């Protein structure tokens, strides 16, 4: 296995020599900007990368092909490059405090910085936006607090509202309420005239609804009566039973909808068949349960019903017969069984 001249495996040096060199001032550069290894031939082009240092170029080598700048993620803003003959330097001194808001380029930084210190109280309430995510805010370097991924932070609005609570200023409280509830901001701005107009519209709408309901119910009741009257007139007008039934139907239609104690609905019935019509349909059903289209048309003309009404009546009658036969069969089976 072969190593190049610049690899640390080919360079043979002891740890004691490093320690003795660290105790002396030979490992520090002339500008004292950061910790750099000496450009000696023993060290080659590699420094102590575990300590977060930058590689340096030896005096003998003009430029190395595989050499790249190894930037530690906690050393920010390494942008200044010098000539390849010299070592890389950073203008920022070592003793300066590293800001907490600086990350590498591939890490997504949060635009808002979480500030809980007293400096937040110095901000004016008008400068605090209602939606904190849209406006980026600069993170101060001297603030040691760490940004937290915030969906809603109470300190962003409560800090300003707390300072203005003692000043008794109504504008500050309104801005705080707008920040807490931005959707309901347009409601207090309604004028008194608009409120009166809305009340009038609601009253007029509530007054028109019962009249419409009564108008809708009355045509249905009126529409049901002429059909029954025409059917009864064709069958027999002189019979007293038909007259009594007609008078009862008129009384039912004239009376308003009954209360909840009686189980009667005020709407028109779904199958308004007279006694004569039901008798004729029952006779035909006893003769034949299933009708052809020609026979159904003849019956509908004789009974003064539509083709669809006769068809539906026969379907319902067949379902009723099926249900009755099932009940009778169950009753017979249970009667034959003896329980011990």
Curated annotation (Swiss-Prot):
A Pfam family reported for this protein in Swiss-Prot or TrEMBL: Homeodomain
Stored CDD domains: homeodomain
Organism superkingdom: Eukaryota
Cellular compartments per GO CC: cytoplasmic ribonucleoprotein granule; cytosol; nucleoplasm
Region span, Disordered: 185-268
Subcellular location per the Swiss-Prot or TrEMBL entry: Nucleus
PROSITE patterns, sorted: HOMEOBOX_1, HOMEOBOX_2
One of the GO BP terms on file: forelimb morphogenesis
Keyword Transcription attached: yes
SUPFAM superfamilies in the record: Homeodomain-like (SSF46689)
InterPro entries found in the cross-reference section: HD, HD_metazoa, Homeobox_CS, Homeodomain-like_sf, HXA10/ABDB-like
MF-aspect GO terms: chromatin binding; DNA binding; DNA-binding transcription activator activity, RNA polymerase II-specific; DNA-binding transcription factor activity; RNA polymerase II transcription regulatory region sequence-specific DNA binding
Protein keywords: Developmental protein, DNA-binding, Homeobox, Nucleus, Phosphoprotein, Transcription, Transcription regulation
Residues bearing PTM Phosphoserine: 238-239
Predominant localisation class: nucleus
Compositionally biased region (Basic and acidic residues): 242-253
DNA-binding region: 266-325
Polar residues bias locations: 203-217
Function: Sequence-specific transcription factor which is part of a developmental regulatory system that provides cells with specific positional identities on the anterior-posterior axis.
Family as reported in the entry's similarity comment: Belongs to the Abd-B homeobox family.
Xref: PANTHER family: HOMEOBOX PROTEIN ABDOMINAL-B, HOMEOBOX PROTEIN HOX-D10
UniProt name for this protein: Homeobox protein Hox-D10
